[in-house]
Amino acid sequence: MTLEITGSELIKSKLIDAPERCGVYRMFDVNKQVIYVGKAKNLKKRLTNYIKSDLDNKTLRMIANTCFLEYSITNSEVEALLLEAQLIKKFQPKFNILLKDDKSFPFIKLRLDHDFPQLLKYRGKTLNSGKFFGPFASSTEVNTTLTELQKIFKLRSCTDNYFNSRTRPCLQYEIKRCYAPCVGKINKEDYRDLVAQVKDFLQGRTKELQENLSKKMEELSSQMRFEEAAEIRDRIKALSYVQLKAGVSDIVKDADIIAIVEKNGHYCVEVFLYRAGQACGNIPYFPTSTENSTKEEVLEYFLLQFYQKQQVPAEIIINHEINDKENVIEAIKKINNITKLNIIIPISGGKAKLVQNAAINALFSLEQYLKKFAKNQEIMLEIKELFGLSEISERIEIYDNSHIQGKFAVGVMVVAGKAGFDKKEYRVFSLSSRNSSLSSHASPLSSRNLIAGSSSYFLDPVVKPRDDIVGDDYEMLRQVLTRRLTRLKNEPHKLPSLMIIDGGRGHLGVVKEVMDKFEMNIPFVCMSKGVDRNAGLEQFHMTGKEVFTLDKNLPIMKYLQILRDEAHNFAIKNHRLGRSRAIKLSSLDDIEGIGETRKKALLHYFGSYKAVCDATIDELTKVNGINKSLAEMIFRTLHKSL
């Protein structure tokens, strides 16, 4: 494809028809990948800025890479801000300031659809069918809180299936972590009272809760029910301890405390979460592509991207001004369909101290990040020299597979760069064959759901299975690389600087064969365990070079081992998940009258094997092709297998 004009000349040509109105513009590279999205109050004036002579290096590189340009007119600046944020989230352009880690925060969910509800960990922005508390900064925060609540209030933590199948109390009852409602050790009314206490605690009404518990303790004491009174006393003590440890605040109720700091052109944004006056943890973020950007710009882009994914509190407290504050507030309100939002920068008082503390934490996080970043930079330079690369690696892909005699086979790819592992880029490849157990049990499932629990990772489309793949590492690698290079043809912006394959000389030939087939020349190396398969004696195989080893004490050797081990562990994890899922699905296969069609209908209707197990007989009969007698048989069989 020959392009007539690119770069600044292209922008000049677009200026002729560019309107003097607000809107959003998009720059594309030669492969028509979006490389930058920008907003403007006046599109013509903004584009004119790109043909000036005093541009910074980042902008010059961006313009040099621009081969196509499009723009959209909007009705208002808020609409332009909103569209820009949505397009950045969708395309992740490399020259935009990006929030890489955008996974949603976890919540504590209290079920409301059971006589004896339990508390669960929940992750997702859609909050329905229950009472939710949070968000929390990490799963660790949620798990710690759940453990403390279970000790204090002793609500059940088991699944409905386990609950319904009990004939005697389980271990949780014996260690005083549950009141065993499954076998009638507590009645519904008393259990509901406990649930109400949990709600009060999680909603921050701890003072009222402790007052009510104190009154109840006195009543029980006056009735000579000293054992029950002592239990309430212990609960009050435990609540006081948890409050002290959690850092309850009377300064803010529902708020996010957000501080931004900068050092050597790198930024850290630290977020502290407060809900119902309780600290719910903190987490640092390190936005990318911030070269030549100001704090105002970085913080504005952070807020717009962050609150596309996260729940918005009543108040956002920040430590630095942002551009277009009122329009940012309106955009966040529209994104989240809310009517009220307050963003403030406190000058003095308790809130100012909170945001100052967040800034101190942000600076510490940034310093730790920069140390790690500098080490990675040094290692990347060594990798460039060791493997004869033309440039310092921005992206390294590491491949491995896992199987048991060819069954439940998966291939994986993990990705590393200058900032460490990029887990959003990890991939899982299903390599099931017609003869494998996984194939026979998992056939009703889409490739997207084939590996249970790996929803954070993409599974490449499954190619037609081969009967001769069983136990053949070379064929597995051939399939993985064929599918990966096919995708790279459509995603040239994700071409790795280096591929590392867990394997030896034979694997080297397979990689070369697939590379030649696709007419691609990506640098690659095969890394094998070496003599006696001992760690530290790894051998490296490259085309046209003698096999070589490295001193096991060298930092680069330790780094390469970390890369290899990450891929290996990821492969084993997904192999086990696939094997576990296949074993579970076999319970459906054992039921007379359940063939592939009905099994597929069950999984499609309920969404997962666990949901099928949790279903009642009446719910099972709602599935097309499942009558009452078959539903009863399914219910009995699944509950017998649990």
UniProtKB/Swiss-Prot annotation:
<comment type="function">
    <text>The UvrABC repair system catalyzes the recognition and processing of DNA lesions. UvrC both incises the 5' and 3' sides of the lesion. The N-terminal half is responsible for the 3' incision and the C-terminal half is responsible for the 5' incision.</text>
</comment>
<keyword id="KW-0228">DNA excision</keyword>
<keyword id="KW-0234">DNA repair</keyword>
<dbReference type="GO" id="GO:0003677">
    <property type="term" value="F:DNA binding"/>
</dbReference>
<dbReference type="Pfam" id="PF02151">
    <property type="entry name" value="UVR"/>
</dbReference>
<dbReference type="InterPro" id="IPR004791">
    <property type="entry name" value="UvrC"/>
</dbReference>
<dbReference type="InterPro" id="IPR001943">
    <property type="entry name" value="UVR_dom"/>
</dbReference>
<dbReference type="GO" id="GO:0005737">
    <property type="term" value="C:cytoplasm"/>
</dbReference>
<protein>
    <recommendedName>
        <fullName>UvrABC system protein C</fullName>
    </recommendedName>
</protein>
<dbReference type="InterPro" id="IPR035901">
    <property type="entry name" value="GIY-YIG_endonuc_sf"/>
</dbReference>
<feature type="domain" description="UVR">
    <location>
        <begin position="207"/>
        <end position="242"/>
    </location>
</feature>
<dbReference type="GO" id="GO:0009380">
    <property type="term" value="C:excinuclease repair complex"/>
</dbReference>
<dbReference type="Pfam" id="PF14520">
    <property type="entry name" value="HHH_5"/>
</dbReference>
<dbReference type="InterPro" id="IPR010994">
    <property type="entry name" value="RuvA_2-like"/>
</dbReference>
<keyword id="KW-0742">SOS response</keyword>
<dbReference type="GO" id="GO:0009432">
    <property type="term" value="P:SOS response"/>
</dbReference>
<dbReference type="InterPro" id="IPR001162">
    <property type="entry name" value="UvrC_RNase_H_dom"/>
</dbReference>
<dbReference type="InterPro" id="IPR036876">
    <property type="entry name" value="UVR_dom_sf"/>
</dbReference>
<dbReference type="InterPro" id="IPR000305">
    <property type="entry name" value="GIY-YIG_endonuc"/>
</dbReference>
<keyword id="KW-0963">Cytoplasm</keyword>
<dbReference type="Pfam" id="PF22920">
    <property type="entry name" value="UvrC_RNaseH"/>
</dbReference>
<comment type="similarity">
    <text>Belongs to the UvrC family.</text>
</comment>
<comment type="subunit">
    <text>Interacts with UvrB in an incision complex.</text>
</comment>
<dbReference type="Pfam" id="PF08459">
    <property type="entry name" value="UvrC_RNaseH_dom"/>
</dbReference>
<dbReference type="Pfam" id="PF01541">
    <property type="entry name" value="GIY-YIG"/>
</dbReference>
<dbReference type="GO" id="GO:0006289">
    <property type="term" value="P:nucleotide-excision repair"/>
</dbReference>
<keyword id="KW-0227">DNA damage</keyword>
<dbReference type="InterPro" id="IPR038476">
    <property type="entry name" value="UvrC_RNase_H_dom_sf"/>
</dbReference>
<dbReference type="InterPro" id="IPR047296">
    <property type="entry name" value="GIY-YIG_UvrC_Cho"/>
</dbReference>
<dbReference type="InterPro" id="IPR050066">
    <property type="entry name" value="UvrABC_protein_C"/>
</dbReference>
<keyword id="KW-0267">Excision nuclease</keyword>
<dbReference type="GO" id="GO:0009381">
    <property type="term" value="F:excinuclease ABC activity"/>
</dbReference>
<dbReference type="InterPro" id="IPR022439">
    <property type="entry name" value="RPE4"/>
</dbReference>
<feature type="domain" description="GIY-YIG">
    <location>
        <begin position="20"/>
        <end position="97"/>
    </location>
</feature>
<dbReference type="InterPro" id="IPR003583">
    <property type="entry name" value="Hlx-hairpin-Hlx_DNA-bd_motif"/>
</dbReference>
